[in-house]
């Protein structure tokens, strides 16, 4: 029996990156052997064993044979005669198919180290195309390692495109698509994930609402980048910058809202382009459709839909009437969910800066709207009750006093 460290831990170690999770492969053993050594089996379909001391995951070396459509349609062989090389060849990319022996030797039968040095994401064998999930995984790795100069090999991109066109992607469950996508949203360059999926044709299959933005023009005066898909990717990049070092914000939710904020532009009638009157309200339906299909968590969906509807309100914050401001606050339920509103404001800032040449533009609207929020929050609910108001009258009076507080702040707010 031999044990090897495999996959991402070996890859990241060679890249000089911190190793988060360590996965191990056991060669020359079976279930009974590991159980007799005190390992605890978890998972029925695919047996993984927990080391009794470290609690790290160990798996028996295996081979896979395609048996039906989708990413689960495989027959596995866990025989003790399976070699390390046989186990490694079933993996997706060469850089993920390296192993390290217990004495520290790197085993690299498929050229992963060379591809690591050359910054190439390359598939190992034609069996790559047997698993449609790999299209998303490779796009996610491209997003993760883009800042290090990694590119997808042309032949791998061609295979991903074949897979996207084959109909295999339709067999992926919503949960798996969202899991990969949420992971991608947390990478350094999530825009690369969506751009890669667009290049391969997978975006139109899995994220048709986002893909529909491609080629939809905006007025060049306000959007020098013109194209709505390009703008959305620039907004996503800005959202990354704004959330990367802010532990308070739900960064993947902010980034998802950034992607959805202009989905309504794909529905703009041709005869009024490049203008997009009413795209805010129009964006709610495609956002809801996307979220329902991919079973996106409700928090993400709510933030994305509200962002679609109200992002231009913040752009025009200085023009809003006090009544409109309070309606906005009520729609976001800022009284009970203050963080969500701050996340929304970050998307609005990302939207402003996600335009070619506007990357460092000042956005005083956030300070202004937060001042109005502060004044509205100063209104004391208990005082309203103490003043004798009851039931619905409490809510009505509270709204009146909040509007008055906002009006006073608007009047006294310094303008340059």
Swiss-Prot record:
EC number annotated for this UniProt entry: 2.7.7.72, 3.1.3.-, 3.1.4.-
One Pfam family named in its UniProt record: PolyA_pol
Matches recorded under PROSITE patterns: HD
InterPro entries with a match to the protein in the record: CCA_bact, HD/PDEase_dom, HD_domain, NT_sf, PolA_pol_head_dom, PolyA_RNA-bd, tRNA_CCA-adding_enzyme
Cofactor binding note: Magnesium is required for nucleotidyltransferase activity.
A single GO molecular function term of this UniProt record: phosphatase activity
Keywords, comma-separated and alphabetical: ATP-binding, Hydrolase, Magnesium, Metal-binding, Multifunctional enzyme, Nickel, Nucleotide-binding, Nucleotidyltransferase, RNA repair, RNA-binding, Transferase, tRNA processing
GO biological process: RNA repair; tRNA 3'-terminal CCA addition
Tree of life domain: Bacteria
SUPFAM superfamilies: Nucleotidyltransferase, Poly A polymerase C-terminal region-like
Cofactor(s) demanded: Mg(2+); Ni(2+)
Binding site for Mg(2+): 21, 23
Catalytic activity: a tRNA precursor + 2 CTP + ATP = a tRNA with a 3' CCA end + 3 diphosphate; a tRNA with a 3' CCA end + 2 CTP + ATP = a tRNA with a 3' CCACCA end + 3 diphosphate
Binding site for ATP: 8, 11, 91, 137, 140
Binding-site residues, CTP: 8, 11, 91, 137, 140
Domain (HD): residue spans on this chain: 228-335
Assembly information from the UniProt record: Monomer. Can also form homodimers and oligomers.
Sequence similarity: Belongs to the tRNA nucleotidyltransferase/poly(A) polymerase family. Bacterial CCA-adding enzyme type 1 subfamily.
Domain notes: Comprises two domains: an N-terminal domain containing the nucleotidyltransferase activity and a C-terminal HD domain associated with both phosphodiesterase and phosphatase activities.
Other facts: A single active site specifically recognizes both ATP and CTP and is responsible for their addition.
Function: Catalyzes the addition and repair of the essential 3'-terminal CCA sequence in tRNAs without using a nucleic acid template. Adds these three nucleotides in the order of C, C, and A to the tRNA nucleotide-73, using CTP and ATP as substrates and producing inorganic pyrophosphate. tRNA 3'-terminal CCA addition is required both for tRNA processing and repair. Also involved in tRNA surveillance by mediating tandem CCA addition to generate a CCACCA at the 3' terminus of unstable tRNAs. While stable tRNAs receive only 3'-terminal CCA, unstable tRNAs are marked with CCACCA and rapidly degraded.
Protein name: Multifunctional CCA protein
Organism field: Haemophilus influenzae (strain PittEE)
